[in-house]
């Protein structure tokens, strides 16, 4: 395409830039290809109805988005459920395990709830904290995975008016786990950094955290990431993951409907979203949206995180992506009381949802 010039107008994605993009789409000045948000941040651009769906593009280019994981395409779908953007990278949350502690006590990794309960009991009996967490500071990851596990991805993603039974069932596991002795005795007073040190120093066996946590773990050889085990009676499929993919490459109708630009636009996006390109964008950090190979310099923990995220059966966004900040703060602040039995999950969730509906 020696007759085509690519103009790169990349900028920081701040509010001013988002306003400029929305204005460009509104007045017919949109680009041919854009890497942009896929979530509610894209609402103004989506309202202009100037982006082509992947389904439409695949009719002419069957290999379009061909290297992209199905779970990543679904996660990058717009709020209306239509897949238009081809993502490159994202982040994941998962269960970090000190595998050497599991091996020391002859335990299997907690790939199902029976193994989780066995591990908690055995570690507690041997003076190892089963789960590093600060319930008063950052119970976020446990909120997400327990509710997702109980409700399944579809019901986890809704924003109801009153507390759903499955959400309550998920949060009730905080008390179950606390009663088992799964958490540090001072989980109500320590902060998240202290909880993280318990895991890193091998005083605790497990910790739920995000892909950003992996690089700070000192023992990259004996630490692994596993899928969160489904709680008893939970509706989530095994391998369900909390994570996020919030941007991707779009083709606009302006380029798609132009015979001189359609082929170039499609091949440009394919060049930036194939396995090799995604490997470059990803660089070993977070989640790769395509099935990539481990980098030569990746640690065993890095490879474990890659394998875990690539095998995810579904990717669900965190709870705070659907609730107002005020409502979410109330949810987080109420977890200690739920874990001690001082407050029921139903009572807490009804307050959260009532505030969220304001």
Task: Specify the residue positions occupied by each region the protein language model found.
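C-terminal capping/gating helix-and-loop segments adjacent to ligand/active sites or protein-protein/ligand interfaces
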Residues: 78, 284-290, 304-357
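Glycine-centered hinge/linker elements that transmit conformational signals in sensory
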Residues: 120-123, 159-188
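Extracytoplasmic/periplasmic solute-binding protein
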Residues: 75-88, 93, 117-160, 204
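Conserved N-terminal structural module of periplasmic/extracytoplasmic solute-binding proteins
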Residues: 1-48, 59-65, 232-237, 347, ...
């Amino acid at each position: 395409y020696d007759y085509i010039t690519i103009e790169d107008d990349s900028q920081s994605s701040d509010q001013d830039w988002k306003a400029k993009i929305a204005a460009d789409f509104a007045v017919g000045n949109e680009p041919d290809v854009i890497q942009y948000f896929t979530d509610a941040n894209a609402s103004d651009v989506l309202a202009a109805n100037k982006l082509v769906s992947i389904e439409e593009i695949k009719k002419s280019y069957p290999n379009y988005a061909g290297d992209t994981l199905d779970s990543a395409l679904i996660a990058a779908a717009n709020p209306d459920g239509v897949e238009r953007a081809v993502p490159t990278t994202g982040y994941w949350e998962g269960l970090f395990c000190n595998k050497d502690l599991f091996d020391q006590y002859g335990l299997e990794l907690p790939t199902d709830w029976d193994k989780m309960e066995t591990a908690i009991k055995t570690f507690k009996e041997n003076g190892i904290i089963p789960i590093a967490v600060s319930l008063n500071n950052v119970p976020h990851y446990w909120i997400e995975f327990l509710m997702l596990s109980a409700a399944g991805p579809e019901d986890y993603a809704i924003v109801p008016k009153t507390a759903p039974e499955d959400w309550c069932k998920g949060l009730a596991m905080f008390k179950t786990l606390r009663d088992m002795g799964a958490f540090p005795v001072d989980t109500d007073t320590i902060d998240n950094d202290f909880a993280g040190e318990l895991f890193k120093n091998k005083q605790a066996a497990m910790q739920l955290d995000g892909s950003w946590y992996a690089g700070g773990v000192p023992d990259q050889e004996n630490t692994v990431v596993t899928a969160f085990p489904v709680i008893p009676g939970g509706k989530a499929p095994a391998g369900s993951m909390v994570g996020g993919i919030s941007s991707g490459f779009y083709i606009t109708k302006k380029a798609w409907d132009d015979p001189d630009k359609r082929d170039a636009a499609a091949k440009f996006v394919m060049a930036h979203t194939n396995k090799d390109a995604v490997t470059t964008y990803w660089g070993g950090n977070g989640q790769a949206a395509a099935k990539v190979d481990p980098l030569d310099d990746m640690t065993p923990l890095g490879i474990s995180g890659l394998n875990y995220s690539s095998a995810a059966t579904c990717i669900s966004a965190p709870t705070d992506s659907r609730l107002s900040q005020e409502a979410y703060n109330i949810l987080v602040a109420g977890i200690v009381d739920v874990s001690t039995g001082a407050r029921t999950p139903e009572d807490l969730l009804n307050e959260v949802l009532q505030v969220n509906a304001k």
